[in-house]
Amino acid sequence: MNIVILAGGRSAERQVSLVTGKACKRALEDLGHRAKLIDPEEDLPLRLWQERQAGCDFVWIALHGPGGEDGVVQGMLEWLGLPYQGSGPLASALAMDKLVSKQIFRAEGIPTPEWLVWDEAQPLSWAECVARLGSPLVVKPSNSGSTVGISLARDEVSLAQGLALASSVSSRVFLERYIPGKEITLSILSGQVLPAIEIIPAQGDFYDYEAKYAPGGSRHLIPCSLSAAGLARCEAAGLRAYRVLGCEGLARVDLRVDADENPWVLEVNTLPGMTPTSLCPEAAAALGWTFTELVERMLQDALQRAALTRSAPSGSRPSPQPA
């Protein structure tokens, strides 16, 4: 097949996206496909139309962050009639907006940490924030990925610094209750839950951008240290979160697990990193899959769903389903 890979873009996750795109390009070429990498610019709609006219069969999205995994590119590809891997426009948009996804989780009875939206026009004092959510507090931008803009506030000074950081990458910021315990991530491929990974930061127990990307910033446990019952609860919560947002293909669910092994869903990433050292390929490797085999499974899954969509009377993707 002729495959166009979208990688790079303008988000804060540009460099990770480029590494993902190049790794996937090599894997797709190893599978016998012709792969072409495009770094999206303002003329992307025209460029994709031209690629379609030139015989493009499939688009592989390796973008991260706003403009890549928020449903914009997915909607564009739907309109052009070009198949692609991963979730559709609606699920992508819902998952990208952490505030909206948390509201859905709460409505569906999926445990997620308590939060409050920061209102710059009516700012709360540190004492008021702590009274509602406890201390420390997690400061988060509503729509960013790769832990960009996330920080842990332990006092009034670090709260102000965290708010400034989060506001630099998102117009909406919220504070979230910090759940002491374990950081667990679940990779899910079309309903199949891959082995859970426990993430242990080298410094403290908060998984931020530095812990994620700095050499030696964290270590991973596979299998994780949860009991069989705790792992089952974690997998059930992660799968429910995946389904209620209407995710398709590969997605990653990030959770905290407290001292009683109760899971708390933090967010869902519909276009997780796909570098050879990323979490999803690491989980797949625990099943004996190579990176190329994971890419092949993702591609075949997407092609099967595209065929079903074309044959459906409405020609549309499925909507999010109650868990």
Curated annotation (Swiss-Prot):
Binds 2 magnesium or manganese ions per subunit. It is an enzyme of class 6 (ligase). Its cofactor is Mg(2+); Mn(2+). InterPro entries: ATP-grasp, ATP_grasp_subdomain_1, D-Ala_lig_Van_CS, D_ala_D_ala, Dala_Dala_lig_C, Dala_Dala_lig_N, PreATP-grasp_dom_sf. Mg(2+) 1 binds at residues 254, 267. The keyword rRNA-binding does not apply. GO terms for molecular function: ATP binding; D-alanine-D-alanine ligase activity; metal ion binding. Disulfide bonds: none annotated. GO terms for cellular component: cytoplasm. It catalyses: 2 D-alanine + ATP = D-alanyl-D-alanine + ADP + phosphate + H(+). Pathway: Cell wall biogenesis; peptidoglycan biosynthesis. SUPFAM superfamilies: Glutathione synthetase ATP-binding domain-like, PreATP-grasp domain. It holds the Pfam family Dala_Dala_lig_N. It comes from the Bacteria. Residues 102-300 form the ATP-grasp domain. Mg(2+) 2 binds at residues 267, 269. Belongs to the D-alanine--D-alanine ligase family. NCBIfam families: D_ala_D_alaTIGR, PRK01372.1. Cell wall formation. This is D-alanine--D-alanine ligase. It comes from Synechococcus sp. (strain JA-3-3Ab) (Cyanobacteria bacterium Yellowstone A-Prime). The gene is ddl.
